[in-house]
Amino acid sequence: MKYSTLVSIAAFISTSLAATVPDEHYSTLSPSAKIPSGASTDFSGTFGIQVVTVESASALSTDTATSTLTRNDNKKEATPVAQITDGQVQHQTTGGVSAIKQISDGQVQHQTNAAQPIAQISDGQIQHQTTAKATATPVQQINDGQIQHQTTVQPVAQISDGQIQHQTAKATATPVQQIGDGQIQHQTTVQPVAQISDGQIQHQTVKASATPVQQIGDGQIQHQTTAAAATTASAVKQINDGQIQHQTTTAENVAKAQSDGQAIATGSPSSNSTLSDDDDLSSTIPKACSSANNLEMTLHDSVLKDTHERWGAIVANHQFQFDGPIPQAGTIYSAGWSIKDGYLYLGDSNIFYQCLSGDFYNLYDENVAKQCSAVKLSVIEFVNC
């Protein structure tokens, strides 16, 4: 009787461990497809990521790493994605493109906001404001009956020739203006992705500017979406759970990493080089000042980690998040990461998907739902400022 009881207890313990402890070979869970030629499985220093939307699904088979990233040479600063505590990556969807953040559980989310109303000015033209405010703003009509659309809390201006111009501010969205010839101009800025504490990645979506990805405490990545113009790169942030969040406000955000949200990627470093300031490839990677709550990652031997030593992994539901000190049970990929042409790769692919979940977009390695859209993860190198 005692013997059978001991056997039952031992069986229960082994079953419990199997459910909570991943396979001991988790560090070799990489895609079967090899990393592309010329990619690097090592990066000297820390870096963040910025969400870049792929223009069309039909372009996925022929799209190159540099074709979808519009760089502003006049802008010298790029803002990264942030990470929250759980390690998840989230992208907020508030009216514009904002940075990705990572929350404590490691998921990636993208928040969304409501659109603003159209105003009509005296000339009869219709204007539509594109600022990141949650409340709707009315349409204005000018003298000639045209309707103008304001892109910020500020009004649209018209110069002597009748053209309409829209100024682009780095930290806040500026209004559309009209110059003397009647043409309309619109300025743009880009914001980074952030990571919150859970490791999730969030990406806010601002019309006027793209914000960085952030990571929250659980390692999830979130990307917020607010209304702002996009011309300056903003960083991803990380919160306590390791999730990655990307805010979409007009202000530039830097990729931040907090308590538990790490990311790791393994690969074959023998055939690849390490990126550094002296390498030609580093010239394609924008630089940004690091700050609190930004998703900061390291890449060694194709293993991706955050500053909390959490693994960057694709978990059972195909979501990209940071877990640690070792990946969670059921992890699909925990290695095979690399950098090429300024983009983050998993295996031979640099295409990921942001999928709307409530107020945020989560990041996945596959198209798991109809509300998902293809994106790329642009690398931002952090420097001391």
Swiss-Prot record:
Query: What PANTHER family would the database entry show?
Result: CELL WALL MANNOPROTEIN CIS3-RELATED
Known post-translational modifications? Covalently linked to beta-1,3-glucan of the inner cell wall layer via an alkali-sensitive ester linkage between the gamma-carboxyl group of glutamic acids, arising from specific glutamines within the PIR1/2/3 repeats, and hydroxyl groups of glucoses of beta-1,3-glucan chains. Highly O-glycosylated by PMT1 and contains one N-mannosylated chain.
What's written under domain? The PIR1/2/3 repeats are required for covalent linkage to the cell wall.
Keywords attached to this entry: Cell wall, Cell wall biogenesis/degradation, Glycoprotein, Repeat, Secreted, Signal
Tell whether Repeat is among the UniProt keywords. yes
Give the family, as the similarity comment puts it. Belongs to the PIR protein family.
Residue ranges of PIR1/2/3 repeats: 78-96, 97-115, 116-133, 136-153, 154-171, 173-190, 191-208, 210-228, 233-251
Q: Which residues are glycosylated?
A: 272
Any one GO biological process? fungal-type cell wall organization
The highest taxon in the source lineage is Eukaryota
Please describe what happens when the gene is knocked out: Increases sensitivity to calcofluor white and Congo red.
Q: Give the species.
A: Candida albicans (strain SC5314 / ATCC MYA-2876) (Yeast)
Spell out the subcellular localization from the entry.
Secreted, Cell wall
According to its UniProt entry, the function of this protein is described as:
Component of the outer cell wall layer required for stability of the cell wall and specifically for cell wall rigidity.
List GO molecular-function terms, semicolon-separated: structural constituent of cell wall
Which residues constitute the signal peptide according to the record?
A: 1-18
Q: Which Pfam families match?
A: PIR1-like_C
Q: What residues correspond to the site Covalent attachment to cell wall glycan?
A: 88, 107, 125, 146, 163, 183, 200, 220, 243
Region: Disordered, residue numbers: 257-282
Protein name, UniProt field: Cell wall mannoprotein PIR1
